[in-house]
Amino acid sequence: MSEQEPAQTPSAPRTRSVSRRRLLTYGRNAAIVAGAALAVPATAASAGAAAPATTAKGSLAKARSAASLDTTLTNVVTSWTGNTFSGATEWVQDFVFNIAVTADGAVYTVSFWDEAGDYAGIYKDGHLIGNCHGANGDAVAVNSTYAYLSVGNGLTRYTLDGTATSLTYAVGSPPAAAAATDTQVVATDRANNRVLVFDAATGAVQHTWTVNQPGSVAIAPSGEIWVVSNITRDTNDGHFWHVDTANPAKILHFSNSGAALAGTISGPSAQWIPTSVAVDANGDLLVGDNGPLRQVHTYTGLSGTPALARSLGQAGGIGAGTPGRVAADKFFGIVGVGGDSAGNVYVAMFEFGTWLRKFSPAGAVVWQLQGSAFVDAADFDPASDGVEIYTKQCHYSMAYTKAPGSDATWRSYTLDSVTYPQDARLFLTGHSHAAASPFLKRLGGRLYMYVTGMYCAHLLIYRMDGEIAKPSGAIFKARWNGDDPTWPPNQPATGQWIWRDLSGNGNFEAGEYVQPGDGSSSPSNCWVWYVDDNGDIWEGGDRNLRRYPLQGFDSQQNPIYTYESMETIALPAPFSVVRRLHYDVAADVMYMVGYTPDQPFDNAHWKECGKVLVRYDKWSTGNTTPTWTLLLPWDTASTIVVTMVSLAFAGDYIFAAGIETRGQVWVWKAADASPVGTWTAGSVIGTIDRSGWVDVPYGISATKRADGDYLVQVEDDLFNKVLLYRWTP
């Protein structure tokens, strides 16, 4: 996957071992064909016959000779989006909270999670070369011989190859930041509002002093210390920095023993957010500012009166020029800065992803890395013939004539946290994965994006305003009580609600919420969210289905949905529970998948889409007689558990993905549910264990191109990417 402005191609990476979480041990050739499907034709369905009662190990397995998915489809090209690398030998980690840079340009990172185990990756020359295993948190520092990273309530010393030593530095709480020379290590203790200076060789505390809300820290060549003050950072998944404009953030100047010195840096404005500081090769101070400017400032004259000498990056960051359009010098989510002995500058960015960039002393990008699709699904702009792809916050343009890995160009970043600070994508991602799966729709000539998450508790609505996805509306099944108790502001005290951006500013304001008359919550154990081509929203599936017909658009071009217009629809036979649906408006065909009395729900497999898929023709006429009924692959006794989690419908085919089956796709004909075959990811991503579980209910999407090819995308959380298949029937 390439960037909007490709830099030089990095040389081949070093050979390295890989640590992975939750890997299943089976070979590349062990494609899953167990759990075959059984189709019941229309004649049986019209006679009132339900799908035959089977068990996962019994009749389903025996039915393979009659309705087999053993055929491995070979005319499939595998590619991916969301990560610079495929995951075959290297990948860009899920998150980054801070960086430190050695004199020779090795970038040490730290974070709180990476699905494949690289919480604290080490990068050099545009490649992942190692990891400091066991580190977890916000602080990282380096000197000429060691790295120092957050572990628990302090720091642990690592060798530069990533090996932990027994030497620790007791901060007393998870440190906010750290800096190091060959003789000293400095850490900031945000819980106790203090700075600590340690002897680098022994871990003994040499000095400590008070700083209000300390953040990042740097040590000048003179040994003097610069500390960001009056800044706080969330401890939840968002890890965002905050300042109080009534008490603006400042960078304070101290002697090595903690005596206050002149030269306080107040920044270019009271709104600045100095998230990170570092000293460059010239002895000047680099400051990562994630306020409205979103730039990296350089301050000179540290021995006297510091002065702002220059700023790297366009003022306004990702909001500059064409808002959202990607350029190497347009920043967002700045969390780390650093410099090497040659004067190069390194910038790390985080808004639920990892972006690392290296710039020459003249400000030209040298290389850049991206990992921005951890537990992300993707969808196609329906008007683009599969060329334009969107995840919840990134937009890619595809060139299918190019080789996998070079066919995707990162076109835009659709989230602007400065213009829309209440955007739900800033509050619903992280470990809860409450914003993960987008649905793209063209309505009234405009592009809209609907987003749900792993637990389907809500549906977010965005209107594409150029390259920015502007918050437009939302439907929540109940009051939201997330990590941030202040979000969303003004929501009702209890019950389900619909929000619409009446003012057009993207903020959740009083008077913009509506509720049903009884103030009730919607049943929580419901997994259906579907937006059809008319813009109608389908929801529910527990005891009934609920349809929200699109009521038009308001003056802000927001789609209008109301409780008054909502329709309740009984579940059709043979279902007792519906977990997913797809309504083809043009063909008037409804597909539903779920459980029946003969194929009941199993709480051990709560995320799955169900065992039974049914097609109903002429749905709008009230017909609920199945055209056909299909028993989906389901084998919980096999070495690799086979259960379906997500389906996609395009052209003449139905596509499905399982949870533990790692990017494998099953294919049936939509007309009669006859089996076509299956495929797994190609060697471009490595062996089959180099792809991960499909962790979200809506983790697969598909479209048919004008040339007859089919494109299928599958969420792949293990190595922070989205799989993209191109299949020629």
Placement of each model-derived feature along the sequence:
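N-terminal secretory signal peptides
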Residues: 1-22, 29-45
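Surface-exposed loop and turn segments in beta-propeller and other repeat-based domains
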Residues: 77-88, 263-270, 309-329, 410-430, ...
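Beta-strand-rich domains and repeat architectures in extracellular enzymes and scaffolds
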Residues: 86-116
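Repeated scaffold domains used in trafficking and secretory/extracellular systems
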Residues: 95-98, 135-142, 173-178, 213-217, ...
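Residue-level detector of Asp-centered blade-edge/turn motifs that repeat once per structural unit
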Residues: 101-104, 142-144, 180-182, 219-222, ...
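Conserved beta-propeller blade signature
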Residues: 107-108, 146-149, 185-186, 225-226, ...
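Short, conserved, GDST-rich strand-edge loop motifs in beta-rich repeat architectures
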Residues: 230-246, 460, 480-488, 594-610
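Blade-level signature of beta-propeller repeat domains, shared across WD40, Kelch, NHL, RCC1
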Residues: 697-729
